[in-house]
Amino acid sequence: MAEISDLDRQIEQLRRCELIKESEVKALCAKAREILVEESNVQRVDSPVTVCGDIHGQFYDLKELFRVGGDVPETNYLFMGDFVDRGFYSVETFLLLLALKVRYPDRITLIRGNHESRQITQVYGFYDECLRKYGSVTVWRYCTEIFDYLSLSAIIDGKIFCVHGGLSPSIQTLDQIRTIDRKQEVPHDGPMCDLLWSDPEDTTGWGVSPRGAGYLFGSDVVAQFNAANDIDMTCRAHQLVMEGYKWHFNETVLTVWSAPNYCYRCGNVAAILELDEHLQKDFIIFEAAPQETRGIPSKKPVADYFL
């Protein structure tokens, strides 16, 4: 019981956007690893569930998400990756989600995004933030080790496939995803990379991605994949959509974006998708948390790069 009360105290601290001690991060990551190592590359999730897209260290907007969507454990959540980078509070955001995962493992599912990577976080903010807030890279090391244990995808009620980016020309079936050795840094190419980097595009077949990783995939590819796996749709994140969510290919692919006013300047709204026990869909649209609730960030954001 002492462990749970410790964890509850840490969750309360993190909810207030207060850091926990480095030794507590180490212990939290060790517990998280024990839970995550048991999860499948295609983690099974039961409805009802609320599906969320990118957060990118926008901690106060994550709090707003919980305000409109309900708290853990009352609401069952699936987050589709990109917890860190670009926002001011990647450390607090990731540690809060991880602490909730350890405390309520059956009520929150975290899958990996392309930013859950050592290489990417060294460029886009998380590494520098860990260094600034903890005075060393140790916390970054603990967290990036956990990234390697995150599931690559999820399947809700056997019918809705959830993944950060999209499909891969190397993957026709969910069973092929299940055979990937995920406990590694995100590779530069290949199926694991594609799942985290690809985007839908109004085309047929496969196209070269302007991102330099993953592929563009067309409606025919999705139709084949959905039929082969007897699923209704693919749900993904990875791309900013100004309206918070966007349907593609006759409602067979859905993009969900959950970081409002992305990078504190894009002016977009955010969305989360509520699925009931019959997989009926309800979108909740929300805006950035009001300025007065935010506190003052400790540093200007990282330099601009393409969004």
From Swiss-Prot:
Instruction: Tell me the residues on which N-acetylalanine occurs.
Output: A2
Task: Please name the SMART domains in this protein's record.
Answer: PP2Ac
| Binding positions for Mn(2+) 2 per the UniProt entry | D82, N114, H164, H238
Report the catalytic activity.
Answer: O-phospho-L-seryl-[protein] + H2O = L-seryl-[protein] + phosphate; O-phospho-L-threonyl-[protein] + H2O = L-threonyl-[protein] + phosphate
PROSITE patterns membership: SER_THR_PHOSPHATASE
State the signal peptide span. none
Necessary cofactors: Mn(2+)
Question: Can you supply one Gene Ontology CC term for this chain's record?
Answer: cytoplasm
Function, in words: Protein phosphatase that is involved in many processes such as microtubule organization at centrosomes, maturation of spliceosomal snRNPs, apoptosis, DNA repair, tumor necrosis factor (TNF)-alpha signaling, activation of c-Jun N-terminal kinase MAPK8, regulation of histone acetylation, DNA damage checkpoint signaling, NF-kappa-B activation and cell migration. The PPP4C-PPP4R1 PP4 complex may play a role in dephosphorylation and regulation of HDAC3.
What is the name listed in the Swiss-Prot or TrEMBL entry for this protein? Serine/threonine-protein phosphatase 4 catalytic subunit
The species this protein belongs to is Rattus norvegicus (Rat)
